Design a protein with these regions (language model features):
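Arg/Lys-rich, intrinsically disordered low-complexity tails that mediate electrostatic binding
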Residues: 1-24
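Active-site-flanking segments in enzyme catalytic domains
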Residues: 28-59, 70-214
């Protein structure tokens, strides 16, 4: 009986720890990870290069070591890193599938990889996770972000998405990701040419953002 109990205990402990797979990313059991490989044939015959190794290494390092990402790893069900000849966007978070996708491209470097991770994972993925696990702080951030001008011109595209009395729209979500860029990188790669939030308003959003990211 004692041997059975010890065996059972070891099994439970292992299942609660994230482990590195052959891909090098520290994930929990049943998290799907795909890193694209080179396919032969050249562009004219649908051949595709593998993602640049330095970009892959940077993504792996961020996911494995960043404390903001480690908090929500159980929330991430899939990670895809691939290369494409042309792209509409280099990164995305699919909230329905809880899936992060990174698309490498000739013009993308390791700094771009950082910014995309900050925007998509520490921004969008964390915002979705916090709705359940940091709901008081999540609601407070959204109420303030909803009443503020957009952080940058990219967020301004979502102004029409704002709704009075609602704090769970794409506008607040994008405000959160924009603040994530500022907090993590010290700057945003999006412009501020239009009617955007003042420095004081951004500082107020940063304050409540940090309250949600304890």
């Amino acid at each position: 009986m004692s041997q059975i109990l010890r065996k059972s205990k070891r099994k439970v402990n292992r299942s609660k720890r994230a482990k590195k797979g052959s891909h090098g990313i520290k994930v929990y059991k049943n998290t799907y990870v795909y890193i694209g490989k080179e396919t032969s044939g050249g562009w004219s015959r649908d051949g595709i290069p593998a993602p640049k190794q330095e970009v892959v290494d940077r993504i792996i390092m961020r996911i494995n070591t960043d404390k903001e990402i480690r908090k929500i790893m159980k929330h991430i069900k899939g990670i895809t890193i691939k290369y494409a000849k042309t792209i509409n966007r280099a990164g995305s978070w699919n909230g329905e599938k809880q899936w992060f996708e990174f698309v490498d491209h000739a013009n993308i470097d390791v700094d771009d990889a950082d910014e995309i991770i900050y925007h998509e994972i520490i921004g969008h993925a964390y915002w979705q996770w916090a709705k359940k696990w940091r709901n008081v702080e999540w609601t407070k951030f959204n109420e303030i972000a909803n009443n503020m001008p957009p952080v940058n011109d990219y967020v301004a595209k979502y102004v029409d998405n704002k709704r009075d009395g609602r704090t769970d729209t794409d506008y607040e979500n994008e405000q959160h990701s924009a603040i994530a860029e500022l907090v993590m990188a010290g700057h945003s790669y999006h412009t501020k040419k239009g009617k955007v939030a003042s420095d004081e308003q951004v500082d107020e959003m940063i304050k409540v953002w940090k309250e949600m990211h304890y």
